[in-house]
Structure formats: C-alpha cells, structure tokens
Design a protein with these regions (language model features):
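Metalloprotease/metallohydrolase-associated module, dominated by Zn2+-dependent proteases
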Residues: 1-61, 77-123
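Active-site recognition of the HExxH zinc-binding catalytic motif
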Residues: 64-76
Length: 123
C-alpha cells in the first residue's frame, strides 16, 4: 500500500482531468521547489489548462491544494479575475480563494457524510 501511494506522487504523473467550466484541466505532479515558506503547493495555469501539485504533500495538504487550485480555475473561467470584478487583484483573489478552500475543507472533514450526500444528489 505504501509503495502504491509513493508511485501516485511521482513527478509528471497525470492524476486525472477535471472539467472546470468549458475547459478540461489536467492535474499533474511537480517536484517541490520550495526555497521559502511562502512558496505555493500548487498552481493553476489557465494558458496550459494544467493544475500542478507538488509531490511532497501530505494527503490532507494535497486535497486542500487541489480544491484551492480548482477554485482558482472557477474564478478565472467565470471572469471573476478581470478588471472591475471582485477578484481583479491577485492579492484579493488569493485571500478569498484560500479562505473559501480552508472553510470547505473544514466542513468536509467535520461532516464525513457530506461529500457522499452531494455526490448522490448530483447524479
């Protein structure tokens, strides 16, 4: 089991695709390049339609990072980041996306039944 988990976290391995709006976004692994604590765990590249996630993350950080980057994709594809819109400044976007991600992750962790319920209701 442990070996399988390590294999899943290899650099360059495409985990899956996620549909965000009209785009199919590839989710891939990338070797950690952290040089300071403020470096990010992941990145959404709207030009390439790729979400990159660092390989050295715990399962919880990996889930949080993926949700965080998906929310960046939703904000971008729905034009919330263009001039005059609520998230038109990078600082505003990051604060809002981070707070919503962390809030949702806490709700999901505290209410284990919720994701299954939502999945069942959206068939």
């Amino acid at each position: 089991m442990e070996k399988k988990k390590k294999e899943e976290k290899k650099e360059g391995k495409i985990l899956e695709k996620v549909k965000i709006g009209y785009q199919d976004v590839v989710i891939e692994r990338e070797t950690s390049t952290f040089s300071k604590q403020t470096d990010s765990y992941g990145e959404y590249d709207h030009r390439k339609n790729i979400i990159s996630i660092q390989t050295e993350l715990s399962d919880l950080d990996e889930a949080n990072t993926l949700l965080h980057e998906i929310l960046h994709g939703i904000a971008y594809i729905n034009s919330l980041t263009v001039g005059g819109m609520p998230l038109d400044k990078e600082e505003k976007e990051e604060i809002v996306i981070n707070q919503i991600t962390n809030g949702l992750m806490q709700v999901f962790r505290d209410n284990k039944w919720l994701l299954d319920f939502l999945k069942e209701k959206t068939k």
